[in-house]
Amino acid sequence: MAIATINPTTGQTIKTFDSLTDAQVDQKLQKAIDTFRSFRKLSFADRARMMVRAAEILESEKDSLAHLMTLEMGKTLRSAVDEAVKCAWACRYYAEHAEKFLADEQVETPASRSFIRYQPMGVILVIMPWNYPFWQVFRFIAPGLMAGNVGVLKHASNVPQCALKIEEVLVKAGFPEGAFQTLLIGSGQVDRILDDPRVAAATLTGSEGAGVQVGSGAAKRIKKVVLELGGSDPFIVMPSANLEEAITVGIKARVINNGQSCIAAKRFIVADQIADKFQHEFVAQMEKLKLGDPFDEKTDVGPLANAEAVTSLQADVSASVKAGAKVLTGGKPANLPGSFYLPTVLVDIPKDSPAYREELFGPVASIFRVKNADEAIRVANDSRFGLGASAWTNDKAEQERFINELEAGMVFINQMVFSDPRVPFGGVKRSGVGRELSTYGIREFTNVKTVWVK
């Protein structure tokens, strides 16, 4: 099987790679487990030196790394530069804090000594998507390797050069060659790797369907798995909110990464008394967005990742319109070469339509009108997903209600949802299990050992 990387801006094939054979995968898994036996014994200080060096490389090479990201998956160049810098931040954060996060925890018991020790699990299968081709991977690398684990990466098939470059950065930073290896393979080979006794656990960021497959595969083998899946994040705007700011941030939250982010705002839930003004200005700002070449500094929205993404998004929009939704702007692919979709706003959305029930992955905003906070919470929670939620209100009582009652792993008040190494990232319901980042993220891939000395 060949793995081709295609420029979504032009539709042209950039490069083609051969998939690894089963024998080649076996060699890499053996190299990983052999490396783990020595890598786990390194001190936190030794691993931190490598991680800081990785951060320095990410920062010094941010422009070339950004160019590669934009070339392979179409994010705007300036956002790709930001992504490289954010990866460096995560590396530095865990280099500084990993030892503290995983320090022995003393427990008061009748024993002469009793404590909890966190130890690395081993070889982790890392399955990552294309939408943040560096950041999604470094969200595992920084905590995972600082904890003493090693990783094998099955990256999305449309970003193979990004995957190989990540491995190159780590080797250049001084990590052993077996500490983090890229597997250029198809999805059909994943279950075999998950079944391999040398693989201790898995982490996946991806679709709900992929999560079900990998999660059930891990369960069959009694292996730990962390799943960060889809989101249909609500963006609630109440009468007391700063409306101008909410609209400006809402636009950014919807079209970030060309609308292809699990934590992008997708369902705009707006109080009736401000809905007309919100809707009018929101549509006006969406229509002003510049769609085009992601290498152009003036571009706001680049292409979707591939032609299949355009087809899927158009199918969801068309089905929603057929069910009764109205298009206020956009609603179709752009008349441009490549995989472009017009910034779109939908209203009057029926409950049985994709715009209500599914995660629309692209620059499509769905607006819902509600009477009050009660209805806003009900509509927001009427989803099988529960990743992030953003609520805009200056009413303290409403803020507390949203914090307590929204069914989401992350609730941001008067701010768009984003990831930050200092706080846990993850969702509830069908948005996944486990957490990434923060203290919680680094402990996900450790064995928690109870020690009791009489």
What are the language-model segments listed below?
Residues 1-113:
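N-terminal Rossmann-like NAD(P)+-binding subdomain of aldehyde/semialdehyde dehydrogenases
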Residues 8, 22-25, 44, 62, ...:
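Residues at or immediately preceding the N-termini of alpha-helices
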Residues 5-9, 29-30, 226-229, 257-262, ...:
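Short, flexible turn/loop "capping" segments at secondary-structure junctions
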